[in-house]
Amino acid sequence: MWMIAASAAWILLLRMADSAPPSSREHQGSSVPDMKMTGFHLVETKDGAKLWEIWGDAAEVFEKEGVAKVKKISRQVAVTLYSEQGQLTSLSDRATLNMRTKDVRLDGNVTATAEPGSSLQTDSLDWSAQERRLFTRSPITLVKGGLLSRGVGMEAETNLERARLFGRVRSQVLQHRVDELRRDLPIPRKGGS
């Protein structure tokens, strides 16, 4: 029901923006949004499959630029990205949606967790809808399978199963993983035969 109401509000607001007199839209400039919304939830699908979902306290739509900017007021913006490899659920202070390409950019205190349990932290993260891949040029911390890696810049599958850090990479095995590995090692025997 909520999704239907949000969709109806979105369509109504788009029609209202289209019906505004041309002179009023011309004077707005690029810094004034064509629409403002609160309690924002948007789902993008392609051929019946979800590409992403975005939830936010507030959103502004800039039709001429073809972007929607979602921001937090009290709760972080939540974005779930879907691909054949799996899904990634993330939180950030802001998200920008390119309404033409359907790409999503997350900015400010970005944290994300993938289905298999991998996670990341960074300042900004881009998701390409066409490639269904993640990208960043910012410093990043990636935790995957008991390994903590830090670096600058990353390219990864949506589920973080395959990730490549680009520069200043440092990795360490997390202590709980070291303990697990030690338990799995065979116990050395003393003496002969």
What would you call each of these model-derived segments?
Residues 1-193:
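Mature-chain termini and adjacent capping regions
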